[in-house]
Amino acid sequence: MGLFTVTKKATTPFEGQKPGTSGLRKKVTVFQQPHYLQNFVQSTFNALPADQVKGATIVVSGDGRYFSKDAVQIITKMAAANGVRRVWVGQNSLMSTPAVSAVIRERIGADGSKATGAFILTASHNPGGPTEDFGIKYNMGNGGPAPESVTDKIFSNTTTISEYLISEDLPDVDISVVGVTSFSGPEGPFDVDVFDSSVNYIKLMKTIFDFEAIKKLLTSPKFTFCYDALHGVAGAYAKHIFVEELGADESSLLNCVPKEDFGGGHPDPNLTYAKELVERMGLGKSSSNVEPPEFGAAADGDADRNMILGKRFFVTPSDSVAIIAANAVQSIPYFASGLKGVARSMPTSAALDVVAKNLNLKFFEVPTGWKFFGNLMDAGMCSICGEESFGTGSDHIREKDGIWAVLAWLSIIAFKNKDNLGGDKLVTVEDIVRQHWATYGRHYYTRYDYENVDAGAAKELMANLVSMQSSLSDVNKLIKEIRSDVSEVVAADEFEYKDPVDGSVSKHQGIRYLFGDGSRLVFRLSGTGSVGATIRVYIEQYEKDSSKTGRDSQEALAPLVDVALKLSKMQEYTGRSAPTVIT
């Protein structure tokens, strides 16, 4: 048992350490500045109640991106100095964001300890590497992201910090080896517990899904499957779950070795960045003679996001959460007794609203940011939720969960084919989606992202959209000049949300233009990029007529896209003639 001491280090504040919707994200080179990470970590410890630090157990892990291993050692030494009793670390510092949430909620240490929170080292879907992005966020005892009351306190602390505590003589712990290393300091014993987090996570998944039913599907010669981890942390779970537990062929796994730079790619599961999977599923530009798999899915860097694909078919995230909600009770044992409610983020399409109305479920529309769903779940008001940015989840944890979404889809496909695995033709992903549209109508939906836009120009564009809302007659006049074939705007506002659980109000959550036929235009500035601003434009049109639900999405939305770009003066403000990404 090694002895360590505590050192007080003098420091000065850094500007801009304000945690966004998912923590603090900056370039690696910013985090590598002396004292930068330490200031943020100490500001977090200082923002927490004393009993969540002194004598407490905290988790420190992440998606394995570049600088994670250094950060784990720094945070561990600071935890020891601040009186933390135990630090739990995923082997090789790898733990998906949903697995961290599960570990906080479910894991009990050998000595009966439970975690009170976690430092998660991730910048999610942002690229990794020496010149790319790093991030850190703090999750609370419920397994969910710190609420604004805590992140505001953290930020306030970063502006006044003058010293931090660190145990510099605490040796680095070998995080590649599972086991407990014990030390002793001024306040008593301190343990570092390195463990394989996939064990806890798989155990939890088995309480939710019928693994035998999914295994029958995955081992059926008729069903083919492909999972792409984009070299993110999902790779640390994929083989255990899909191959060892569910019987899929190992060749069905793509890019499932976690890498510090995600193999030089962009670990964002969408049609632009998951190129290899998109090609394999028959959605790429090159035409291949190889028959695509029946089902494909991808994850982002920290495995909380998912993309679902059928053979030559893309499932929008907005449709995905609606379809899971519509089929959950019959297909997923965890939901067999019914859903408590459903929720979506404001920019997500209203497909879930229609399901909720038809099934008589409680429904909530919340700002972007998973913590808003967490409040509803803690209050027992919501079972399934999702957002258009490829995040889907349920109340089994307090984060979105990419592998959960894949298992949910496999459960639905297995249920639809339970008497059909020996038949001529399987019910496919495309069949399930088209049947859903026939029942509930279709929400044609697209998102245009303009990344790394000049922040000043982005703010001006948004301010102009707000000022236009004061006269809808002028807006409608303008729209008719752009396109005469779109409905009238009947309401326009800046979305604000009053939390039904704690009464807190979140303002300025996105600009909305709502049309008489149920169509919507939404404009948001994103808080998850590390440089410049990202403008996101969400364009949605509802079609109830089942004979018109089979059109190409971009073609169906062309009039509204035209209106959105001209109404916002996108090119004029940003200088961009096209978006960076279209989803």
UniProtKB/Swiss-Prot annotation:
- Tell me, what does this protein do in biology? Catalyzes the reversible isomerization of alpha-D-glucose 1-phosphate to alpha-D-glucose 6-phosphate. The mechanism proceeds via the intermediate compound alpha-D-glucose 1,6-bisphosphate. This enzyme participates in both the breakdown and synthesis of glucose.
Which annotated residues bind Mg(2+)? S124, D300, D302, D304
What are its cofactors?
Mg(2+)
Q: What is its EC number?
A: 5.4.2.2
Main EC class of this protein? isomerase
PTM-bearing positions, type Phosphoserine: S124
Q: Partners and quaternary state?
A: Monomer.
A Pfam family cross-referenced in the UniProt record is: PGM1_C_vert_fung
- Under the cellular component aspect of Gene Ontology, which terms does the record hold? cytosol
Q: Return the similarity comment.
A: Belongs to the phosphohexose mutase family.
Name listed for the protein in its UniProt record: Phosphoglucomutase, cytoplasmic 2
What's the catalysed reaction? Answer: alpha-D-glucose 1-phosphate = alpha-D-glucose 6-phosphate; O-phospho-L-seryl-[protein] + alpha-D-glucose 1-phosphate = alpha-D-glucose 1,6-bisphosphate + L-seryl-[protein]; alpha-D-glucose 1,6-bisphosphate + L-seryl-[protein] = O-phospho-L-seryl-[protein] + alpha-D-glucose 6-phosphate
Residue numbers binding alpha-D-glucose 1,6-bisphosphate: R25, S124, D304, R305, T368, E387, S389, K400
Cofactor: binding details: Binds 1 Mg(2+) ion per subunit.
Lineage at the top is: Eukaryota, Viridiplantae, Streptophyta, Embryophyta, Tracheophyta
Give the annotated active site.
S124
Indicate yes or no for the key word Zinc: no
Where is this gene product found? Cytoplasm
Gene3D superfamilies, per database record: Alpha-D-Glucose-1,6-Bisphosphate, subunit A, domain 3, Alpha-D-phosphohexomutase, C-terminal domain
In the record, what terms sit under GO molecular function? magnesium ion binding; phosphoglucomutase activity
Output the PROSITE patterns linked to this UniProt entry. Answer: PGM_PMM (PS00710)
Q: Which GO terms describe its biological process?
A: carbohydrate metabolic process; glucose metabolic process
Q: Which UniProt keywords apply?
A: Carbohydrate metabolism, Cytoplasm, Glucose metabolism, Isomerase, Magnesium, Metal-binding, Phosphoprotein
